[in-house]
Amino acid sequence: MDASDGRIGLAAYSASKGGVVGMTLPLARDPARNGIRNMTIAPGIFGTPMLFTMPQEVQDALAASVPFPSRLGTPADYAKLVHQIITNEMLNGEVIRLDGAIRLAPK
């Protein structure tokens, strides 16, 4: 999310994420003749060990901020997308946001 929704004070972090996004298509094209594909998944707000250290009210507010579905992402959500990427060979050189349509505020 920070590659496209950069936040105040996080310019270097956003730039690093933007670098990954910028490499996605060239990294798909270069080895394509060998049948190698490249995709980037840009996850939104997921339930992670770091997030679970936050107070419950913060976790609830983050989950509620996701337009649909209004919840935190799960490992199963991520795994379903990975499975689709693996099984659909037409997916190549793309960045897929897995974020429930959330966009971060500047702060």
What are these regions (language model features)?
Residues 57-77:
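Catalytic Tyr-x(3-8)-Lys segment
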